[in-house]
Amino acid sequence: MDSYEYSELLKKLEQKIENIKNIIKPDLITKRLKEIEQLENSPDFWNDAKKAGEIQKEKNRLSRILEKFEEARSSVEDAKDLFEMATEEEDTETLNMLFEEAPTLEEKVNKIEIETMLSGENDDKNAIVTIHPGAGGTESQDWASILYRMYLRWAERHGFKVEVLDYQEGEEAGIKDVSFIIKGENAYGYLKAENGIHRLVRISPFDSNARRHTSFASVMVSPEVDDDINIVIEDKDIRVDTYRASGAGGQHVNKTDSAIRITHIPTGIVVQCQNDRSQHKNRATAMKMLKSRLYELELEKKRAEQEGIEKSDIGWGHQIRSYVLAPYQQVKDTRSNKAYSNVEAILDGDIDKIIEDVLIAEAEKESK
C-alpha cells in the first residue's frame, strides 16, 4: 500500500461512516436511550415482565450499535489526522504503521456497517432453515448433508442453539430433507443471504471412474414468526398427512407414527415436522414453519416490487453460490461476485465473510 491508496481508503471509509450515520441516526438513538432510562426508573416498569424484557433487549442493541459506531468513527478520524501529520512531516515509520493497520481499520468499519444492515424488521429473529437436495440421487443428497453440517458448525461458532424439526436420511448416503431452527441474535439477518440454490462441483466419491459431478441443493430460510405476526391459513388451503418418522435416531428424531406433513395448496409449499412424539406438537410446529415460509414469501414479493425484480426471480429458485472442489478449489457467490479459496474452512462453517460481502454488495446496489 502507498499514500495514494491509503488516502483513497480513508475517503471510502469516511463515506461509509457518513452512510451509516444517515441510517442509524446516532442523535435519535441517544434520545431513545434516555427515554428507556426514564422508563427503567419508573416504579411500575417491571409490572409487565415481557414488555420490560423487550425494552431491555432494545436498549442493549442500541447501546451496542452506538458504541461500535463511535469507535469506528473516531478510529477513522484519528487515522486521517495521523496520516495528514505523517505525510506533512514525511514520517515514513508512522506511514508504514498506518498502512499495516489499514485492514484492521477497514474491518472495524465493515463490522458496524454489517450491524447496521442487520437492523431490519425481522433480522433479529431466529431462522428456520430447510435444505432439500436437487435431482441426482445420492450425489445431491450427500451435498445436502454437507451443507447441513456447514450450518450446524456456523451456529456452533456463534454459540447459537439448533433444534432439528425434520430429518430424513438418504437411502445410500446424505439426507433427503432436513429442517431446523437456528436460535440466536440476528440468526435470520445473517442466514437470509443463504436463500437459493447452492451448486457443488467435485470428483464424486460415489463414482468408481472418479469423474467430476455437479450437484445442486436448495436452501430455504425464513424468520421464525411469533404470535404478533398475523398470517391467516384457511383449512381448505392445506392438506395434512401423517407418516412414520424416519431419521438419524437418537438425538435427532423420535421413531413414532406422529410425523406431520402439511402442503399449502395455493403456493405448493410443503413443510414437515417429526421432532416430537406428540402428533399435536408436531402439527403446531409444522404450522409455525408454514407461517414462516408464507411470511418469507410475502417479504420476497415486497422486496421484488421495491426493486422491480421479475417475478420469476422471486423465492428460492435461483443459483446464488458455487462450491468447486475439482479441478481447483474455489467458492464464488454470484451476488457479491467474490471468490474465496478457503473452501475447507467454509464447509466447516466459516461463512461469515461470504455472508457479509453479500450484505454489503446488496446494500451498495440499493444505494445506487
Swiss-Prot record:
Peptide chain release factor 2 directs the termination of translation in response to the peptide chain termination codons UGA and UAA. It is found in: Cytoplasm. Gene3D superfamilies: 3.30.160.20, 3.30.70.1660, Release factor. InterPro entries: PCRF (IPR005139), Pep_chain_release_fac_I (IPR000352), Pep_chain_release_fac_I_sf (IPR045853), PrfB (IPR004374). Methylated by PrmC. Methylation increases the termination efficiency of RF2. PANTHER family: CLASS I PEPTIDE CHAIN RELEASE FACTOR (PTHR43116:SF3), PEPTIDE CHAIN RELEASE FACTOR 2 (PTHR43116). One of its GO terms (molecular function) is translation release factor activity, codon specific. Transmembrane segments: none annotated. Pfam families: PCRF, RF-1. It comes from Nitratiruptor sp. (strain SB155-2). Keywords: Cytoplasm, Methylation, Protein biosynthesis. The modification N5-methylglutamine is found at Q251. GO terms for cellular component: cytoplasm. The keyword Plastid does not apply. This is Peptide chain release factor 2. The gene is prfB. Belongs to the prokaryotic/mitochondrial release factor family.
